[in-house]
């Protein structure tokens, strides 16, 4: 075997090894909307935590607000995803009135687009507990509308415990391997 043959063999092994690693990668998609920055903060910290804790994953963040702002068309998801939804409602108390979603409706439109609803593992709701019955009400409404579960909830920007809880749920849904 010549020196050139040996180098070609190394390149082939490296190429095959990288293809093998790509095949094992699991794509995790986090679909969300953030208006005040709270949900953006949570999803960004969740992505970092997932990448630190689990092997062979690629975490994709899809911010619906950016799609709408840039005039991009909705698209069909090719893989399962988890939706994150803050609560914005018209006044009221969430029982007798004040249960009409405002500002976050593009998330519902995205989920309803094509076959996206069937690919959604579920929704993680966020809000402010000061609003009592309205806390995460939109996530509960989406659960009823689309037939998927409310996986978890967090208040405001969420705490590390919330990140860990949601990460554990995602790890189970995607069958992830810890590092």
Language model features: what each stretch is:
Residues 7, 11, 24, 169, ...:
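Short amphipathic alpha-helical "recognition" segments used for binding
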Residues 77-179:
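FMN-binding flavodoxin-like domain, especially the glycine-rich phosphate-binding loop
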Residues 2, 9-104:
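N-terminal beta1-alpha1-beta2 submodule of the flavodoxin-like/Rossmannoid cofactor-binding fold
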């Amino acid at each position: 075997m010549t020196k050139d043959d040996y180098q070609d063999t190394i390149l082939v092994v490296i190429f095959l090894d990288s293809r093998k690693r790509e095949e094992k990668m699991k794509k995790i998609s986090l679909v969300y909307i953030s208006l005040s920055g709270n949900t953006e903060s949570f999803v960004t910290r969740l992505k970092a935590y997932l990448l630190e804790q689990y092997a062979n994953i690629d975490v994709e963040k899809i911010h619906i607000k950016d799609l709408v702002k840039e005039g991009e068309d909705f698209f069909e998801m090719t893989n399962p995803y988890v939706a994150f939804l803050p609560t914005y409602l018209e006044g009221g108390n969430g029982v007798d009135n004040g249960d009409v979603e405002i500002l976050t409706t593009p998330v519902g439109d995205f989920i309803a687009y094509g076959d996206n609803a069937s690919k959604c593992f579920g929704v993680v709701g966020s809000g402010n507990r000061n609003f009592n019955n309205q806390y995460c009400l939109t996530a509960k409404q989406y659960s009823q509308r689309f037939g998927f579960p409310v996986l978890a909830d967090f208040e405001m920007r969420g705490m590390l415990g919330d990140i860990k809880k949601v990460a554990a749920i995602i790890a189970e849904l995607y069958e992830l391997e810890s590092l």
